[in-house]
Amino acid sequence: MTTFVDRVVVHVRGGDGGNGCASIRREKFKPLGGPDGGNGGRGGDVVFVVDPGTTTLLDLHRRPHRRAAPGSPGQGNNKHGADGADLLIPVPDGTVVKDLDGQVLADLVGAGTRYVAARGGRGGLGNAALASARRKAPGFALRGEPGEERDVVVEVKSVADIALVGYPNAGKSSLIAAISAARPKIADYPFTTLAPNLGVVEAGEIRFTVADVPGLVRGASQGRGLGLEFLRHIERCAAVVHVVDCAAAEPDRSPLADLAAIRAELAAYASLDLGGPPLHERPQLVVLNKIDIPEARARAEAAARQIADAPVFLVSAVTREGLRELVFAMAGLVETARANRPAPEPPRIVLRPPAIAEPEFTVRRRGSAFIVDGEKPRRWVAQTDFSNDEAVGYLADRLARLGVEDELARLGARPGDEVIIGGVSFDYEPGIRAGVGHPFGPRGTDPRLHAAAPPATAHWAGDGDDDSAARDEEDG
């Protein structure tokens, strides 16, 4: 029997972008072939896809770390690397994806619905794309960007039209087995059902789905008895059917007391706003069950006379008495809910242009170090191959054009001060004069880094203060 898993925390990471290629065309009778290094491929995305054949999150529970394929590196002769394949993760219909703070990221309903949980990194540019009038044959290429990485909470909420709720051992499983082809485990003890069971019911021309929710107890809305785990499975239901055990022999139990307790739990449950009314305000039916027992029939008839706020049905899942009337009443609620369901809105395209006055980077001081933050500086550092002096010089040029060096000088940075960008620590050396002059010299070198002034060095910062490279369009 398949284990039912309806909540799991998953670590997802998009594939890294492929590195660009630094290559020079070498061909007979072509003395100035020029750069021909191709770009790296884009990393694959991690995508959740609704699959009707998937009913549990067991596979994600067993393998909670998922990573998409990286992009291939570029090659010479202007060959671009292949994009990494997307990682498609099948999930059940009704899956909700949240962040660790509980914010809903996606509500996946309907076969084929997708959500990109982690995007792959963009591929680095090859030296052919970096060539310019000033740098005709770059001896370096850009590294691929790392893919997005995050932890997400994946939950399954049953997609059903009708929810059967009630105390443990109230006969909900017997009822769904009697009105549908579902065959849940049935036994004469509480909490036999530990996972929701779904059954398809037909009433005339109306076909609908019923969910048998595991038994609720007092305090379920606060999590007692795994109530929170069970209650979220009825958030999508259009109507609620209260199944009341009229044969319960406990001294503190009665049909009316059980009904009031379950209604109170539904009213106290703070469900997510999925577009429907609160659970206790949805259409309700009351089923007084087990009337095949003489004492239970007497209790049911007495309780039915005191319930005036919802239709009441006296049924027996064993003898099937009253089931036909109950099924058609359920179908009527489903038909009304479907008729009143608002038409889905077409997707809206929202354009959010960047604010003109928003700075592209910020510099703050922390002790004797300077922290440079911003999408472009972080991304540029992540793309730089620090084993290549020409690539380091290119980074210095980009930062200088952005105004980072001027801002450091304005804040009083001195030679040798630590500057951290994107998790990489640099020794500030204004004598390099980045951004000016022409870096003549062999490919892969930059004469400015070997001048009389002490060279700038870089190493990974150990404090992890800055985030990984952010995504943005390539600049120059």
UniProtKB/Swiss-Prot annotation:
Gene3D superfamilies: GTP-binding protein OBG, C-terminal domain (3.30.300.350), GTP1/OBG domain (2.70.210.12), P-loop containing nucleotide triphosphate hydrolases (3.40.50.300). Mg(2+) binds at S173, T193. Residues 160-335 form the OBG-type G domain. It is found in: Cytoplasm. GO terms for biological process: ribosome biogenesis. Its main location: cytoplasm. Its EC number is 3.6.5.-. The keyword Cytoplasm applies. It comes from the Bacteria. GO terms for cellular component: cytoplasm. HAMAP family: GTPase_Obg. This is GTPase Obg. It comes from Acidothermus cellulolyticus (strain ATCC 43068 / DSM 8971 / 11B). The lineage of its organism: Bacteria, Bacillati, Actinomycetota, Actinomycetes, Acidothermales. The gene is obg.
